[in-house]
């Protein structure tokens, strides 16, 4: 499985040669960034509302930089526009990758889904997704959330890295969830008992091993949510 580290051009870190860098500065509603280096076999990540009108320009930029795939679907993605977008990329020899919300059957795109779950079973989720799409990619979103008990909606609240570190320093005893493939513990937060889920390098490696065993093709990590050192450690999985 190929790993990608997505970062802004202005803060691009030095990375392990086994990883490929992805620039997050491309957007459908803006001029494309200038002067970015060659990225053979790389991926263009496009933010904003999906539009098929820029497929020609996308093809030219991908040819210039050696990119082979385009990841999109982070904003509004109408079904007809998405189908035209994917068709335009495929006709230019580019592989479309769409987020789960934008993906549709028959579009010829790989689907990207998040590895961060607060319920269910990650293996089952990956297996079901693989049965629906033309190829699966994993958004290795770093899970770091706390949940009230009970929590019917499963949403919870985001925890900062510092807040999580403080909870662990206070003596929390995390356990590993085989279903969610993350670590978990209960803690008192502002006088309330809450359930905490989080990822670290160990859970990242476990998720990658599971995904690779099922045939997932690509995994994307966001910098600085994951450091270059985290990404290098993940490449050892």
What are these regions (language model features)?
Residues 1-121:
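Chitinase-like catalytic core of GlcNAc-active glycosidases
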Residues 62-65, 89-96, 128-135, 206-217:
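A structural motif corresponding to the C-terminal end of an alpha-helix
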Residues 75-77, 142, 225-226:
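Flexible, active-site-proximal loop/turn residues at the rims of small-molecule/cofactor binding pockets
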Residues 79-96, 175-185, 228-237:
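Short acidic, glycine/proline-enriched helix-loop-strand junctions
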Residues 94-96, 105, 124-149:
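Active-site region of glycoside hydrolase catalytic domains
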Residues 100, 140, 223:
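Active-site proximal loops enriched in glycine and acidic residues that flank catalytic Cys/His/Asp
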Residues 135-206:
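Glycan-binding loop/region signatures in secreted carbohydrate-active enzymes
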Residues 212-237:
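Acidic/aromatic/glycine-rich contiguous surface patches that form carbohydrate-binding/processing clefts
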């Amino acid at each position: 499985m190929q790993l990608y580290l997505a970062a802004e051009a202005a803060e691009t870190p030095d990375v392990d040669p086994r990883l490929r860098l992805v620039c997050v500065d491309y957007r459908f509603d803006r001029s494309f960034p200038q002067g970015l280096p060659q990225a053979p076999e790389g991926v263009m990540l496009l933010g904003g509302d999906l539009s098929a009108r820029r497929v020609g320009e996308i093809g030219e930029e991908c040819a210039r930089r050696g990119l082979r795939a385009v990841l999109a679907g982070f904003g509004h993605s109408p079904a007809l526009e998405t189908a035209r977008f994917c068709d335009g990329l495929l006709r230019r020899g580019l592989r479309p990758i769409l987020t789960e919300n934008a993906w549709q059957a028959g579009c010829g795109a790989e689907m990207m889904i998040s590895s961060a779950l607060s319920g269910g079973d990650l293996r089952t989720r990956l297996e079901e997704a693989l049965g629906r799409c033309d190829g699966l990619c994993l958004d290795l979103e770093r899970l770091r959330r706390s949940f009230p008990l009970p929590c019917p909606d499963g949403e919870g609240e985001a925890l900062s890295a510092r807040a999580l570190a403080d909870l662990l320093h206070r003596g929390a005893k995390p356990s590993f969830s085989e279903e969610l493939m993350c670590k978990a513990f209960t803690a008192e937060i502002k006088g309330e008992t809450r359930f905490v889920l989080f990822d670290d390098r160990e859970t990242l490696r476990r998720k990658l091993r599971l995904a690779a065993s099922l045939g997932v093709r690509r995994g994307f990590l966001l910098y600085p949510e994951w450091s270059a050192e985290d990404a290098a450690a993940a490449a050892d999985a």
